[in-house]
Amino acid sequence: MAMLTCPTRGPHQKVVSFTFYHDARVKNEKQKNFSAGISGNLTLVRRLYGAGWTMRLYYDLDPGPAGQLQLRQLCELACADPQLDLCRVRRLPGRPLEDASEVYPLLWRFLPTLDPQVSVFLSRDLDSRITAREVAAVAEWLGSPGGEAVHCMRDHPEHTKPIMGGMWGARSDTGGPGEYYL
């Protein structure tokens, strides 16, 4: 059903990465927020970041009827919007990790750091929306002379951790030791 198109896009990909999975411990209402976050953020990636960026959604869904329905909805979104890549974590396109299903799901959004075709990667949360302010900060980071390899954002007084899981990015074109893989 859903095809992994990431490898066919070629080198120098710019990716905004998200994780989507079913967690039985999460109340249905919160799951709906994550589902709404897919289409909402896809629209914002297209509108705010533009055609040069792709939204990657790393997913693993319950094999039951609810998961199959979600998968059909994801496939419909991907067929309707070429900026969405669906990445099933049980069938990734090769080394160093072909099956990430045993990896903690919130870490799946970091998988583009292992993809040699990705030159810029941003990690985001599905339950928050991309903003024009964030896009401006990313553009400033990418446009800075001698640009830093990693970019971290904190946009709230309670964001006190050095790196927030859904508010950072990395790039591989800075000439540093990790130039090929992020």
Predicted regions and their residues:
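Generic detection of intrinsically disordered/low-complexity segments and helix-coil linkers/edges
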Residues: H12, N28, E102-Y104, P162
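Exposed alpha-helical structural elements
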Residues: Q70-Q73, G176-Y180
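Charged, low-complexity surface segments at secondary-structure and domain boundaries
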Residues: T19, L57, G166-W168, L182
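N-terminal anchoring/stem segment of glycosyltransferases
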Residues: M1-P96
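Residue-level preference for long, well-ordered alpha-helices that form the structural scaffold
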Residues: K30-F34, E102, I130
